[in-house]
């Protein structure tokens, strides 16, 4: 597992634009850029070692909507690890994205509905599969967070511990886009109980959150941040240097 977490800028795509939602509500969005490729370039220039892309329309529609934009970003930064989630429901989509140059594909809703699909994807694309677990009050949510299930996030994580999943992206829906601080307790608990490295997401606001997560580098391999770096309450480069111990 990773001893030094990496800061991972989020680029959420909606209608061809770079946006941020509040608690996953599509109607409650803030547009930060009309040019997602330029936004990716900005974060790379500021020191990003990895990017987190989300096809929001894809997550709600169940099919990829932003293929061209995603391909353009991957082409612009061929050596940069890029992960993507949203609308990944079949093997063909995974293959197309990996062929386009993406490093990791995040399976969310499909992982809940069909765990065997995750195992198959891990066999077919070993080392490239991440499971996205979105939760509200510890319970898994699916379909772009529109549906809260009766499955515990920790229970879902345990199902994938031995099938070859690279890591878990854990998002606390209640905090996502709200700038209320990261849920350290649930994030660390998921990593310890699930047995897989976790990428923390949702609620990261400023350096205080980075400081709270740093001690858990043995189980948290990345920290996704969106609104905080877009609104300037967190400096990406400064945060990464802090995690690096510099």
Curated annotation (Swiss-Prot):
Catalytic activity: 1-(5-phospho-beta-D-ribosyl)-5-[(5-phospho-beta-D-ribosylamino)methylideneamino]imidazole-4-carboxamide = 5-[(5-phospho-1-deoxy-D-ribulos-1-ylimino)methylamino]-1-(5-phospho-beta-D-ribosyl)imidazole-4-carboxamide
Tree of life domain: Bacteria
Record-listed E.C. numbers: 5.3.1.16
SUPFAM superfamilies for the chain: Ribulose-phoshate binding barrel (SSF51366)
Active site positions, chain numbering: 12 (proton acceptor), 134 (proton donor)
Amino-acid biosynthesis found in the keyword field: yes
Keywords: Amino-acid biosynthesis, Cytoplasm, Histidine biosynthesis, Isomerase
GO biological process: L-histidine biosynthetic process; L-tryptophan biosynthetic process
Primary localization class, coarse: cytoplasm
Pathway: Amino-acid biosynthesis; L-histidine biosynthesis; L-histidine from 5-phospho-alpha-D-ribose 1-diphosphate: step 4/9
GO cellular component, one term: cytoplasm
GO molecular function, one term: 1-(5-phosphoribosyl)-5-[(5-phosphoribosylamino)methylideneamino]imidazole-4-carboxamide isomerase activity
Annotated localization: Cytoplasm
Record bears the keyword Amino-acid biosynthesis: yes
InterPro entries referenced in this protein's UniProt entry, alphabetically: Aldolase_TIM, His_biosynth, HisA_bact_arch, Isoase_HisA-like, Isoase_HisA-like_bact, RibuloseP-bd_barrel
Pfam families linked to this entry: His_biosynth
HAMAP family for this protein: HisA
Family: Belongs to the HisA/HisF family.
Descriptive protein name: 1-(5-phosphoribosyl)-5-[(5-phosphoribosylamino)methylideneamino] imidazole-4-carboxamide isomerase
Gene behind this protein: hisA
């Amino acid at each position: 597992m990773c001893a030094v977490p990496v800061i991972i800028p989020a680029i959420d795509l909606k209608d061809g634009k770079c946006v941020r939602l509040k608690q996953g509500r599509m109607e409650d969005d803030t547009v930060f850029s009309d040019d997602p490729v330029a936004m990716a370039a900005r974060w790379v220039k500021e020191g990003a070692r990895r990017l987190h892309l989300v096809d929001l329309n894809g997550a709600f529609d169940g099919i990829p909507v932003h293929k061209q934009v995603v391909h353009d970003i991957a082409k612009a930064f061929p050596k940069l690890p890029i992960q993507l989630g949203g609308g990944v429901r079949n093997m063909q989509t995974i293959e197309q994205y990996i062929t386009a140059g993406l490093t990791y594909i995040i399976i969310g809703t499909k992982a809940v509905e069909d765990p065997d699909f995750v195992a198959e994807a891990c066999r077919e694309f070993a080392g490239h599969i991440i499971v996205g677990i979105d939760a509200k009050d510890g319970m898994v949510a699916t379909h772009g967070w529109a549906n809260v299930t009766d499955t515990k996030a920790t229970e879902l994580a345990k199902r994938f511990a031995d099938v070859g999943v690279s890591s878990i992206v854990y998002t606390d829906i209640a905090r996502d886009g709200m700038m209320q601080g990261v849920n350290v307790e649930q994030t660390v608990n998921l990593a310890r109980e699930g047995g897989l490295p976790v990428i923390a997401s949702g609620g990261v606001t400023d350096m205080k959150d980075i400081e709270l997560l740093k001690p858990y580098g043995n189980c948290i391999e990345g920290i996704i941040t969106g609104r905080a770096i877009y609104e300037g309450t967190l400096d990406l480069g400064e945060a990464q240097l802090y995690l690096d111990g510099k």
